[in-house]
C-alpha cells in the first residue's frame, strides 16, 4: 500500500498545480513500483494476483491519502511555521487522540510494563521515527519538492528486506536484487533533471 503514496502525491501535486510531472518521473515511478512489487511478492506473480483486501486496507488507504495530501501541502506551506513547529503541532494532535486511549486501557487493567527495554524503545521511537524522520521528510519536500521526495518512500520495502537479512538472518535471494535494481533505477530516473 505504501507504493501508492508516490502516485497519489503526483496526482495531488498536479491537481493543486504545485509541481509539474515529467516523463522521467512517471517512468521512474513505474520502475520503482515494479521493484516494490517484486520484493513484497518474492517475485511470485500469484501472490499479487491472489491479494485480498479487508477493513484494515481501507484504513491504510485513508492513511495513504492523508499522507499524500499532507506531503503535497507541505510544499504549499505559506505559514511562517518552522519544521519543528509543524512537528510540535502533529505531536500535540497525536497526544490528544492517544492519551484518552491510554487512559482507557489503564482503566480496564491493561497495564504497560515500564522497564528498561520499554524506555529504550520509547526513546528510539521519539528520536528517530517521530522527530528525525519527520524533520528530514519536511526538509526534503522543501528542497526538492513532493514528487521527487515521494519516490524515496519506495526504499521502505528494500530496507525492510535488508534488515530482515541482517537481523533475522533471512537469505538474500535473486528477487531482492531484482527489486532493489528496479527501485534504485526508478528513484534515479525520477530525480533526473529534464
Residue ranges: model-predicted function:
Residues 21-33, 81-89, 145:
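Cytoplasmic-side transmembrane-helix entry/capping segments in multi-pass membrane proteins
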Residues 21-43, 98, 154, 163, ...:
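Hydrophobic transmembrane alpha-helices of multi-pass small-molecule transport proteins
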Residues 11-12, 38, 58-73, 99-148, ...:
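Hydrophobic alpha-helical transmembrane segments of multi-pass membrane transport proteins
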Residues 69-93:
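Juxtamembrane helix-loop-helix junctions in multi-pass membrane proteins
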Residues 17-18, 39-44, 104-109, 168-169, ...:
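Short helix-capping/hinge motifs at transmembrane helix termini and TM-loop junctions
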Residues 4, 26-33, 58, 62, ...:
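Hydrophobic residues within alpha-helical transmembrane segments
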Residues 15-17, 21, 77, 86, ...:
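Hydrophobic/aromatic residues within transmembrane alpha-helices
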Amino acid at each position: 500500500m505504501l507504493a501508492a503514496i508516490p502516485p497519489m502525491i503526483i496526482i495531488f501535486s498536479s491537481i493543486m498545480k504545485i509541481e509539474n510531472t515529467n516523463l522521467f518521473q512517471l517512468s521512474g515511478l513505474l520502475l520503482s513500483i515494479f521493484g516494490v512489487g517484486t520484493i513484497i511478492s518474492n517475485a511470485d506473480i500469484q501472490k499479487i494476483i491472489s491479494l485480498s483486501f479487508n477493513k484494515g486496507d481501507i484504513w491504510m488507504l485513508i492513511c495513504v491519502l492523508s499522507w499524500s495530501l499532507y506531503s503535497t501541502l507541505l510544499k504549499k506551506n505559506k505559514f511562517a511555521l518552522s519544521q519543528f513547529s509543524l512537528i510540535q503541532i502533529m505531536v500535540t494532535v497525536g497526544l490528544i487522540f492517544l492519551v484518552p486511549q491510554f487512559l482507557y486501557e489503564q482503566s480496564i487493567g491493561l497495564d504497560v510494563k515500564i522497564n528498561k527495554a520499554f524506555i529504550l524503545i520509547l526513546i528510539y521511537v521519539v528520536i528517530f521515527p517521530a522527530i528525525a524522520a519527520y524533520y528530514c521528510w519536511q526538509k526534503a519536500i522543501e528542497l526538492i519538492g513532493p514528487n521527487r521526495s515521494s519516490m524515496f518512500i519506495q526504499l521502505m520495502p528494500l530496507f525492510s528486506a535488508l534488515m530482515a537479512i541482517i537481523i533475522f538472518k533471512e537469505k538474500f535471494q535473486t528477487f531482492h536484487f531484482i527489486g532493489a535494481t528496479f527501485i534504485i533505477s526508478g528513484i534515479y530516473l525520477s530525480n533526473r533533471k529534464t
